[in-house]
C-alpha cells in the first residue's frame, strides 16, 4: 500500500479523472485523489494524493499554482481557449500595440482581481455546473469571483501573423484562477477579441515539472518496486501552514486524543490553523484550528493517529 503525494505529469488529451482512474488500475488501490482539475487540453503538474495523504489534498490545493500560457489576440472563442468555436474576429497588426504596451497591461492584473468564470467550466450556479448550461444553449448569470494573481509577466516576443498576435505569459496565482479568462480579459483591455491557445501548469502545491512523472514512468517504477521512493510524505502537503514541534509526551498524547487546548499553552500566536509535529519523528500529529465560538481555544480539525 502506497502512502504519500505523487506529482504526476498530465499529458494533453487526458482528463484529471482519467489520470486517477489509470493510477488506480496501475497501483491497484482506490484510495487516490487529485488536487485540482486540469482541463483535457492542458498539460503539466497534477499532484495526486495516495493512501493516508488523501487527508491533506485540500491543503495541497490551497498552496497556489504557476502556469505558462499562450495568449492569442484577434479571435475569441466559445470556451475562451483553442478548443471552442469562433465567436468574433478582428484583425491585429504590429501598429496596434507593442511589447511595452503588453508589459504595462500585464502589470495591471497583479493582485486581487475579479473574474467571471467561463461558461464552459465546472463552477456551479444553482446547483448545476456552468458547462451543463452551455451544452444546453442556456444562459445564466455568472457570479464574479475574486482571485489572486501573485505575479504575471511576458516570457516571449510578440508574434504577429495572419491577423493575430501571439505571446507567452507566466502566471503565479491562487486557486480558482482561470487563465483562459485572463487571456480574454487581456484582449478586452487591448480592445480586441482574444483567447488562450495553449496552457501548461508548471507548478502546483509546491511541485514543479521536474518532480513530475508520466503515467508510463509510474507504471515502470511500480513494477520495479521503487515507486515509494518518488512519493512525498503527507507532511509536504502541509508546508503552507504554520507549525509547532511538540516535545512533551503528555501534550503529544492529548493531541492524539483530540483534546482541546487553550492557545496560551503554546508560545506561538495561533491565528487560524496550526500543525502539530512530533519533534522526535518529524511526523504530523494533528491539524488544529481556532475554536469558532471560543477564540482563546483551539480544537482538532484532523488527527493523524
Swiss-Prot record:
EC number of this enzyme: 5.4.99.25
Coiled coil: none
Catalytic residues of the enzyme: 39 (nucleophile)
Enzyme class: isomerase
SUPFAM superfamilies: Pseudouridine synthase
Molecular functions per Gene Ontology: pseudouridine synthase activity; RNA binding; tRNA pseudouridine(55) synthase activity
Pfam families listed in its UniProt record: TruB_C_2, TruB_N
Known catalytic reactions: uridine(55) in tRNA = pseudouridine(55) in tRNA
Single biological process term from Gene Ontology: mRNA pseudouridine synthesis
Keywords annotated in UniProt: Isomerase, tRNA processing
HAMAP family per record: TruB_bact (MF_01080)
Role noted for this protein: Responsible for synthesis of pseudouridine from uracil-55 in the psi GC loop of transfer RNAs.
Family statement drawn from the similarity comment of this UniProt entry: Belongs to the pseudouridine synthase TruB family. Type 1 subfamily.
Protein name, UniProt field: tRNA pseudouridine synthase B
Originating organism: Staphylococcus aureus (strain NCTC 8325 / PS 47)
